[in-house]
Amino acid sequence: MANYTAADIKALRERTGAGMMDVKKALDEANGDAEKAIEIIRIKGLKGATKREGRSTAEGLVAAKVNGGVGVMIEVNCETDFVAKADKFIQLADKVLNVAVESGAADLETLLATEVDGKPLSEVVVEEGAVLGEKVVVRRISRVEGTTVDAYLHKTSKDLPAQVGVLFAVDGEGEAAATAAHDIAVHVAAMAPNYLTREDVPAELVESERRIAEETAKAEGKPEAALSKIVEGRVTGFYKGEVLVDQAFAKDSKKTVAQVLEEAGVKATAVTRFRVGN
């Protein structure tokens, strides 16, 4: 007769996130000792970790937190959307985010090397992944600073945690600054600009766009005298699509993002956008 109860199985499942049969087998092997059973579950899970190393991790979530004038955002990946919405996975992401905020880490290598309960965070992630039965990866981290920082998280499906996240910082304080920062963060989530200002666009990319615009205009038979104006117009169109401050504001397309910032009396200082898997 088993020397454990249904309540013991339930409690162990809640503590480990393991399936019912795995928990029962571990309790049998441990002769009902819950702590020993947890150790068995973890060992068996870690043995399978090497088999999971080559697996694709295209699902997951984005998490972010603002503390004063500092915003931190992470992306944590797993293999399936089933695990992505699991409480244990979401709790792990929260743990990683808290470590990122408290440690001051600004890059992935530093974050993963940060000690948590006497071991590197990277080991904690592998162990938790073993319990979940999937490869789990902390893919990236962003840390931005500003007088006012907004973090916006967007769900692309009501059944999943946030798949898109934005950190947006401005040099300015007060209600107007906070409102502008939030509204523009929402805009960034939807419009996905690749650059904050024109100065951030690599010169070689601009020159490439210019050459393409010129060759396209010539192929269309545009008059030589009009080429310069046509090329500049098309390069400006490129900026309007790729550069945040040049984009039409999603909330009011009659304004540019630059105008929204000017009306609020603030200057944009940093922006980061994560989308799971991209």
Swiss-Prot record:
It comes from the Bacteria. InterPro entries: EF-Ts_dimer_sf, Transl_elong_EFTs/EF1B, Transl_elong_EFTs/EF1B_dimer, Transl_elong_Ts_CS, UBA-like_sf. It is found in: Cytoplasm. The keyword Glycoprotein does not apply. The keyword Amino-acid biosynthesis does not apply. Pfam families: EF_TS. Residues 80-83 are annotated as: Involved in Mg(2+) ion dislocation from EF-Tu. One of its GO terms (molecular function) is translation elongation factor activity. GO terms for cellular component: cytoplasm. Keywords: Cytoplasm, Elongation factor, Protein biosynthesis. Belongs to the EF-Ts family. Associates with the EF-Tu.GDP complex and induces the exchange of GDP to GTP. It remains bound to the aminoacyl-tRNA.EF-Tu.GTP complex up to the GTP hydrolysis stage on the ribosome. This is Elongation factor Ts. It comes from Paenarthrobacter aurescens (strain TC1). The gene is tsf.
